[in-house]
Curated annotation (Swiss-Prot):
Protein's UniProt name: Threonylcarbamoyladenosine tRNA methylthiotransferase
Gene: cdkal1
Listed Pfam families: Radical_SAM (PF04055), TRAM (PF01938), UPF0004 (PF00919)
Lineage, top ranks: Eukaryota, Metazoa, Chordata, Craniata, Vertebrata
Cofactor: [4Fe-4S] cluster
Known catalytic reactions: N(6)-L-threonylcarbamoyladenosine(37) in tRNA + (sulfur carrier)-SH + AH2 + 2 S-adenosyl-L-methionine = 2-methylsulfanyl-N(6)-L-threonylcarbamoyladenosine(37) in tRNA + (sulfur carrier)-H + 5'-deoxyadenosine + L-methionine + A + S-adenosyl-L-homocysteine + 2 H(+)
Organism the protein comes from: Xenopus laevis (African clawed frog)
């Protein structure tokens, strides 16, 4: 049996037909065989290729719209600077922009309405949208912001990341607070690139948040508790600004008077350090401060406001002259405290301008309460008065209080406005000679806008030699909100001891390594940058095509 099996296996392995071709013949025949190539689907090949208009972040045009306070405007300038430094083009024409960056304000309902309408308009125009500011920070779950990218008020240093991801089609939300070892910081760094709306004016936020808990305020929900920047960082920022040709600095925050209480310093200490670096011919303007925190420093504040390079101007919101209303607002002062601050400063700083705010129709305000407010305005005749009809903001205690009827709020707002327009604060200054600092153009483009020692607005003729300079003028006309001045003949036009200002739209804060050469226009520099990117893209595309062709020949 085994022998039979072995014989069978040998026969099977060795079995060859007499008609089979020999191995040599098979090899020769193989050379004449042409393999059939599988037909390619041209449509599929085209679909696999990258689209010709691939989106490359950093090449788009961006339109930025900011609502609200000077703090918010400073944030908008920082975001514009970072985007421009990265390569994006900042445009003032929304219809030409690829992306709209909407920087919102939550103080009053009308401002939020404008913000919401702008989002809708952007979406209808098929624009990419990024939102920032106090509205999304305080209430990010609003239905009209679903699917939108959000930059929190303390995350503006990451605007490039958010815009880049949004352009790619992603939705990004950065709403966190900045902390150092658990301690809250003032916000993004002060030395970030920036595009000043006015190259002559630098807005510096000295702190964010506040120590109060006003029952009507929605901003507190967004900006949070007080967090101050160190004195050294603020002085460095001011110094850098003057080196870039700025001739006027605005100090801003939700409450400048509270500055430093969280880091062991105070506002007068900061101000004395700042005046040391203000060049001759440049000026500093102090922003809004609430009465409680200025009371402790009245003597020092009076000395500082008398300094020749500090405007004799202070914005102190009173909101109401009724103690019962102030208590419901949780303003933490009484009307006597406010009067003490104003009276002291008017006595120690002759001619000082006191600006204030008043809310008409706060919940629970009676006719008697409102009459107290009218008496206060009649007594002090504030030259600058911001009158606001009360709007309940969602999530605030005041929104849950019993509301004053709408027609009553409107009547009180109108009555206070009529009182304000019944007196002329500047008529007595006609004929005076004043030194004014010229910083901008009027809205109607007919005049240059300047401010005198008391930060009162003076319109002067449009002489290019005046811009950014101290000019002596004689007042010949006065209106409700301004005066008009004629330059005094043969008077000396004083040029501040600072460098030439940056061009409009030029990025502040860039190191020399990052700055383009001065003789190359910005648009030219951006074009070269984009052309370099395009060259790299074309090279990689050609290389890929060569590889595909080589592989194809091998397959054949």
């Amino acid at each position: 049996m085994p022998a039979v099996c072995e014989s069978l296996l040998d026969d099977i392995e060795d079995m060859v037909s007499a008609t089979d071709p020999k191995p040599h013949d098979r090899q020769s025949a193989r050379k004449n065989i042409v393999p059939r190539a599988r037909k390619r689907n041209k449509n599929n090949i085209q679909e696999e290729e990258p689209p010709a208009d691939s989106t490359i972040p950093g090449t788009q045009k961006i339109w930025i719209r900011t609502w609200g306070c000077s703090h918010n405007n400073s944030d908008g300038e920082y975001m514009a600077g970072q985007l421009a430094a990265y390569g994006y083009s900042i445009t003032e024409q929304p219809e030409k922009a690829d992306l709209w960056l909407l920087n919102s304000c939550t103080v009053k309902s009308p401002a939020e309405d404008h913000f919401r309408n702008s989002i809708k308009k952007a979406q209808e125009a098929n624009k990419k949208v990024v939102v920032s500011g106090c509205v999304p920070q305080a209430q990010p779950r609003q239905d009209y912001m679903k699917g939108l990218s959000i930059i929190g008020v303390q995350q503006i240093d990451r605007v490039v990341e958010v815009v880049e991801e949004t352009i790619k089609g992603h939705s990004v939300r950065l709403l966190g607070q900045k902390k150092d070892n658990g301690k809250r910081l003032g916000g993004a760094r002060l030395d970030l690139p920036k595009i000043r709306k006015n190259p002559l004016i630098e807005i510096i936020s000295i702190n964010t948040g506040c120590l109060n808990a006003c029952t009507y305020c929605k901003t507190k929900h967004a900006r949070g508790e007080l967090a101050s920047y160190p004195v050294e960082e603020l002085v460095d920022r001011a110094t850098q600004s003057f080196q870039e040709g700025v001739c006027e600095i605005w100090l801003t925050s939700e409450d400048t008077g509270a500055y430093g209480r969280d880091i062991g310093t105070d506002l007068p200490t900061l101000l004395w350090k700042l005046v040391e670096v203000i060049p001759e011919g440049a000026m500093l303007r102090l922003g809004m401060t609430n009465p409680p925190y200025i009371l402790e420093h009245l003597e020092e504040m009076a000395k500082i406001l008398n300094h020749p390079r500090v405007y004799a101007f202070l914005h102190i919101p009173v909101q109401s002259a009724s103690d019962s209303v102030l208590m419901d607002m949780k303003r933490e002062y009484c009307i006597a405290d406010f009067k003490r601050v104003v009276d002291f400063l008017k006595e120690r700083v002759p001619g000082i301008t006191i600006a204030t705010d008043i809310i008409c129709g706060f919940p629970g305000e009676t006719d008697e309460d409102f009459k107290e407010t009218l008496k206060l305005v009649e007594e002090y005749k504030f030259p600058s008065l911001f009158i606001n009809q009360f709007y309940p903001r969602p999530g605030t205690p005041a929104a849950k209080m019993e509301q004053v009827l709408a027609h009553v709020k409107k009547r009180r707002t109108k009555e206070l406005s009529q009182l304000f327009h019944s007196y002329d604060p500047y008529d007595h200054k006609i004929g005076q000679k004043q030194q004014v600092l010229v910083t901008e153009e009027s809205f109607d483009s007919q005049y240059y806008v300047a401010h005198n020692r008391f930060y009162e607005q003076v319109l002067v003729p449009k002489d290019p030699d005046f811009m950014g300079k101290m000019v002596e003028v004689k007042i010949f006309e006065a209106g409700k909100h301004f005066m008009k001045g004629q330059p005094v003949q043969d008077s000396y036009i004083y040029t501040p001891s600072i460098t030439k200002p940056l061009a409009k739209g030029e990025v502040s804060g860039l190191t020399e390594e990052l700055k383009p050469p001065n003789n190359i226009p910005k648009s030219e520099t951006l074009l070269e940058k984009h052309w370099e990117r395009l060259q790299v893209f074309l090279f990689l595309t050609a290389l890929l095509a060569a590889v595909i062709a080589f592989v194809g020949t091998k397959l054949v």
